[in-house]
Amino acid sequence: MIFVTHQLPVNVPGQPSLSRQQVWDGLVLKANNALPFVPSMSYCEVTQRHSDTIFDRDIDFRGERFTERITLEQPHRVTFTRIAGPVLGTIANEIEGAADDLRLRFSFALVVAGVEGGSAQEQEYADSMTGDYLKAVAATLNAMRRIAEQKNAVSA
């Protein structure tokens, strides 16, 4: 099993600042349509809504098809549970910290079908996935900043 967690500060000098609500709104947008947020994803469609906070979506990530069940835990966590596809497990996006020190944590625990746990092949996959997820974290924060700037420009 692959376990990875990474945390980045939400607000950095020289970039537009985001509030906890703006980060939450961005995570909800990402859960519903990840394409503007995740460079390695080429397809994302919500396929079934179980409630206001739980829904399923199909995605193509790195050329492979997955079905994920999304759980929104307002105002701090979105959980993506892979329920079908060649890599199963859980991915969590969590907002942490005080208002003046917001952080976004991405964690995943994944099992690659047909790959022995602890093997060199699993480690190679883990390293590749970690790189993709670090890019996704940065792209997610950048997309949230763009959205916030657009909303600020409209309301100004």
Language-model regions: role of each:
Residues 43-44, 141-156:
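Short, highly charged C-terminal tails/helix-capping segments
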